From Swiss-Prot:
Residue ranges that the UniProt entry lists as topological domain Lumenal: 47-92, 137-148
Role, per record: Part of the third module of ergosterol biosynthesis pathway that includes the late steps of the pathway. The third module or late pathway involves the ergosterol synthesis itself through consecutive reactions that mainly occur in the endoplasmic reticulum (ER) membrane. Firstly, the squalene synthase ERG9 catalyzes the condensation of 2 farnesyl pyrophosphate moieties to form squalene, which is the precursor of all steroids.
Protein's gene: ERG28
Positions in the Cytoplasmic compartment: 1-25, 114-120
A GO BP entry: ergosterol biosynthetic process
Protein name per Swiss-Prot or TrEMBL: Ergosterol biosynthetic protein 28
Length: 148
């Protein structure tokens, strides 16, 4: 069993091994938040997921919420690896593509399928995916040594 001191020491060591700069810390933060978002889709019903798809909330079912939670958790794992190994070009590109998929999903739900509207449930994913994409686009060469 791990003691609290073991957890603290491991956490400090892990954080020290991360690439320098704020982008890896951002990716780690988003990854951690995504874990809680994933869990809530399994345990708290439909209320929070329906806030994202606010224009047509009845189209959100328990199954679609859990599927969304699973997808969010997979994205969380990808972004965690990105936080730890952002200097690796393949990992960087995988994280970047995960945000492109997220932006495409939410953009299509807003503009094509019309299940979302610009409310507070939708703005979080929109701001996170857009901010992350722009930031990563501008910082690729810094972290990977490879220009676009």
């Amino acid at each position: 069993m791990f003691s609290l001191q073991d957890v603290i020491t491991t956490t400090k060591t892990t954080l020290a091994a991360m690439p320098k700069g704020y982008l890896p810390k951002w990716l780690l933060f988003i990854s951690i938040v995504s874990v809680f978002n994933s869990i809530q889709t399994y345990v708290s019903g439909l209320e929070l997921t329906r806030k994202v798809y606010e224009r047509k909330p009845t189209e959100t079912t328990h199954l679609s919420a859990r599927t969304f939670g699973t997808w969010t958790f997979i994205s969380c794992v990808i972004r965690f690896y990105g936080a730890m190994y952002l200097n690796e070009p393949h990992i960087f590109e995988l994280v970047f593509m995960s945000y492109m998929v997220a932006l495409f999903h939410f953009g299509s739900e807003l503009l094509i399928f019309r299940t979302c509207k610009l409310g507070k449930g939708f703005m979080g994913p929109l701001v996170v995916s857009t901010t992350s994409l722009v930031w990563m686009y501008k910082q690729r060469e810094y972290y990977t040594g490879v220009a676009w």
